Each structure stands twice: as C-alpha cells, then as structure tokens.
Amino acid sequence: MTAILGPKPNQIPLGAMLPQQTAAGPIKTTTITSGSGTFTPVVTGGLCVVKLIGGGGGGGRGTTGIQAAGGGAAGVAVEFTARPTAALSYAIGAAGVGSTTNNTAGTAGGLTRLGNWVAPGGTGGTATGAAAAAITVGAGWVTGGAGGTGGTGATGQTGSAPGGLPAATGTAAGGSASTGGGGGGGGDSTDGSGGAGGNGDATTGTAGSNATGYGGGGGGGGAGGTTTGNGGNGSAGYILILEYGNV
C-alpha cells in the first residue's frame, strides 16, 4: 500500500501515483456517509484509491460564570491505495454530540473503518475552555484541526485548520464576549468545517454552532452568569472509494 495526502476527495493527485491507463477516471466511485455494512469491489484485486475521515467532536458546555467552553476537534483523514481480494466491512464514525449539561465536555467523534484501516474521530470540546487537542497521527494521515479555546470573559479562539499548524487558522470563529466569554470554534477537517463558538453574555450564553461537511468539530457554548450555551454537534465522517480495476 502507498500512503498519499490530498486536501479534498476530488483533488487526489492521481497522476502522481497511478498508471497512465487511469487518465479516463475511475470505473466506479463509491461515497458512504452513514451506517455500517460491506463494500465489495467491482474487480477482485483491482486498484482502489480510498479516503476515510473520522467523525468530529462535539462542543463543550461550561459552568455558569465568565469562562466559556472549548470547541470540538475535527476527525482525522487518511488516504491510501489497496487491491482488495474480498469484501471489506465498513463503519462510518458518528458525529460527536455537543454538551447540553453545565460543566460537561462534548463527546468524541467516532472512528471510521474500512477493513483494517481506521480514521480516528476528533476529541470533544472541554467544559473548562481548554483546547480539544488534535490527535497525533503518522505518515499518510492528516490531523483534524484542534478545537479553539473558550474565552475567559474574552472572545473565544478560532478553531484550527486540518494539519494543525499554525493554530487557530481554521474557518470557525470563536464567539464574542459580553462579560461572559465566547465559546471556542470547532476544528476543521479536510472535508468539513467546524461550528462557530457561541457568544457570551452577562446572563445567558448562546449555543455553539453545529459543524458542516464531514468530520468537523462543533462549536463550544458561550458563557453566561445564569445560563450557559450548549455545545454544537460535530459532523459525521465518511468514506470515498475510487475503483480503477486491473491497472
């Protein structure tokens, strides 16, 4: 197997790794976005280019006061080639759920699996406002962006982009502050955007937004003196399989 990297499923650099005969494109494209089951290749032993993304973590919800919750981290992406000679079982990583209880972290996203290959889900956003750390991965994998930190009477931090560095360069902004701090933005995956952090308020914080696409992290809830905002939900993972047959 050969590990490759690519930012989007329709931008995999096939010319750099596949024979010239594949220039006409795949003979079949399979996209799986939910559930579990079995994948059977069109051609036994045929070349498959595969991308897996784990589910994104849900955003946290803080305790009453000025400290907002952190955003959820995004799911990991892994790309590889394989020549399966039999059917492979698969399961899509579920979206992490944003917290709806005071002083509680969001849940982690589920791992996505195809055969023996797995893409881990992102960690849930914290109730304390600390960043939901990105998962450390090896070569051929792309780390999902970390969740942004919740603000302590201040604006929440933007979530991180896939790959993780530099921090706070993702698309999901932290929430604004008004006495209570803003929630941290969710991390971005290669194929999903994190949810924005909820806004803080002197009395009632707002909820973090849900992630979009595949594998994004949910936004952290905003802080409030009497009521804190819920965390936003992450988004589920997915599987992309491009089949090229006997090449």
Predicted segment positions?
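Intrinsic-disorder/low-complexity loop/linker signature
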Residues: 9, 24, 64, 116, ...
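Ser/Thr- (and often Asn-) enriched beta-sheet segments in non-cytosolic proteins
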Residues: 13, 29-40, 87-91, 116-118, ...
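Glycine-rich strand-loop-strand elements at beta-sheet edges
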Residues: 31-38, 52-116, 195-201, 206, ...
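Short loop/turn segments at secondary-structure transitions that flank enzyme active sites
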Residues: 56, 120-125, 220, 245-247
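Collagen triple-helix signature
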Residues: 71, 106-109, 124, 144-162, ...
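Acidic, low-complexity glycine/serine/threonine-rich segments
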Residues: 93-158
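Bulky hydrophobic/aromatic "packing anchor" residues in well-ordered structure
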Residues: 119, 214-215
